[in-house]
Amino acid sequence: MLSALASTIILAAAASFAAALPTATADGASKCTTPEKRKSWHDVSESDKKAYLNAVKCVMTSPQKLNRLPGAKTRWDELVSLHQIHALQIHTTGQFLPYHRYYLKTLDFLLRECGLPKEVTLPYWDEPRDAGKFSKSPVFDKVLGFGGSGVGAQSCVMDGPFANLTVNIGPGFKTQPRCLNRKITDFLSSSCGASYVTSAISGSTYKQALDAIYSGPHLYGHMALSMMNGDSITSSGDPVFFLHHGFVDKMWADWQAKDLTKRLKDISGLNAQDPAVGFSEFSGGMEVESAMWGKPGQELLAVTPDPKSGDGGGTITLNHIMSSLGIIPNATVADVMDIKGGYLCYEYA
């Protein structure tokens, strides 16, 4: 549980960020006439795969720019740090789906900054096609993918474009450089199958969809990759994270599409974790989880936005303000509800 001092630091930092960053996006009112098509990695052309992988590697080697995020040396570090800083606000909360949709937009910006051509769109991973056999997926190809399971006691990834990668952010709330580690467990990936996805998006309310997606295919997708993906704080250190969350975002979009008029406004849940619950995938609440991941120190707390920003209370609203800490302008939950609403302009193929 955060101390009174920590809460004070967070509120002070929130005021600072509110002054330094836009509180709403200007392009949300623009028209979406030709939505880009996001494809599963299975269906991305060889040339587009190469362009995407090269852009990711460019982000990983580009110097950091914000000069405020603890441990960040590169633009990729800043992206991972963003997830670390917001971890207790965007998991087991109503923010989970909208924030990760915004997070994908943040990645897209960084990739374009590194020269990713406009015609190459963010890929996702159609996980039902590989359910039960993740290790055989083209996602883990050694040339046109992200490399496979790691080796040795730490399961360090030693093949593919990201072999021998050093991850500077994490584990947990720490900043201890380590290898990119991954250990694929096929039987766990069975819970990402088509029947599980159908069940996850069968509910009639946002809360039902949120809970089912989070604790179902989302959670099992991470668990099936183990190691870094088992670290809910800094799992985005593995670039496969973003393909997985593209799949998660597609599930939400598919659920919304079933009753679009109603569901584009359906949002609910807390805007920060209940300390007694913490991450729903672990029992014991925050105090128990801190034994695994530690607690955010004052440096992290000093750059952590107010989880109630735009809401006026502890429940998330469409007015909730999401921050990338300066990588891209702030956005509201309302901005990201419609993937073809103007602020966003894409669809899933």
List the predicted regions and their residue ranges:
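Fungal secretory targeting signals
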Residues: 1-26
